[in-house]
Amino acid sequence: MSVAASRRAGSGFFRCPFHLSWRTLAPILVCTWSLAVSVQVFGGEPAPAILGVLDGEVKVIPPEGGVAKPASNGMTVTVGTRVQTGKKSTALVTFLDGSTLTVQPESDVTIKQADVGKKRSHVIVGVNVGTVWARVVKLVDPESTFSLQSNTATATVHDGLIGARQEPDNTFTCWTRAGDLWVLEPTGRARAILKPGQMDIVKAGAPSNPQAFFSNHSALRVETPVSVLPVILMPDRVRMAGFTDPDTDVNHVFGSYTGIDGEGQRVVEVPAGVSGPFTLILQGEQDGPFLIRIGALYKGVPVDQHQVSGTLQRGARLAAQLTLQLEGMTNDAKTAKVSGVMIGPLESTDLQLPGKVGVPENP
């Protein structure tokens, strides 16, 4: 096996990331957390979602109310359940249609509606406070919706990658990386329709003002041919974004992007305000040579770009450490400016991704 790397300059290296190719999967395998867990089903009817603890301690309040209790990894959650995260904890809610909701630290959400089916789904998540990130699968029925709701607005998408943040002062911010996002007022009137890469801030007395969205100013981006499955494991070695099989992508990283571009290339982009190291894992879907692209971006503009080539056999895996070079000294990951990416050698690996959870087929 041979691996070679080269560096390229110029802003035309990366292509527009906003073309998605989602496929409905039922049952679906979703890569989630560090232990394989079984889904609990009561009364013969599968609950609409399961809850995973990605990091720290997560608490739940059942629909009937009461005191918040520690959540268990893989427990079912039903309509009316509240999920709460602490300062250093992150939760993942996986719905039976394959859509996922990542609940960021210091957040509180309520599952208000979860009518989930093979061809049609209607999900509403109330964001009481904090930040959430959702990967919404595309279903056959064009009427299917996934909504993030606050007291002041509802952000609704058919499929894509969306997020929202609810502040204690009732300010509601929502954004989309993929998929048109409808921002509706409580009356049902459309306040705005956000295009991929846009955000809007809903605040009392302020008009809609869509603007560019960056979860972090800096980003790490990988492009591969369709014959190679890329996954980026974050420095915490818990969260990841990428492709775990030809038709399944996972996206647990707030502000990240996973999809297929207009030229059929697999694309993974994650926020990168820390040096890392990030771990890139490549899995072959067929025998033969490959050429991948790795680069760093600042506010959406490429600042460092590399090409890496090699050979890969079907089912084999290669891994490399990616370390980002940051300008100046800053403790703010959101505004840190990346200047380059250092790529370690691609080597054979038996490193396993952080576990899998099987979601039972929805009747």
Describe each region flagged by the PLM.
Residues 207-363:
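Extracellular glycoprotein-like low-complexity segments
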Residues 25-37:
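Bacterial N-terminal signal peptides
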Residues 1-22:
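N-terminal secretory signal peptides that target proteins for export/translocation
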Residues 17-24, 141-142, 146:
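Low-complexity, charge- and small-residue-enriched intrinsically disordered regions
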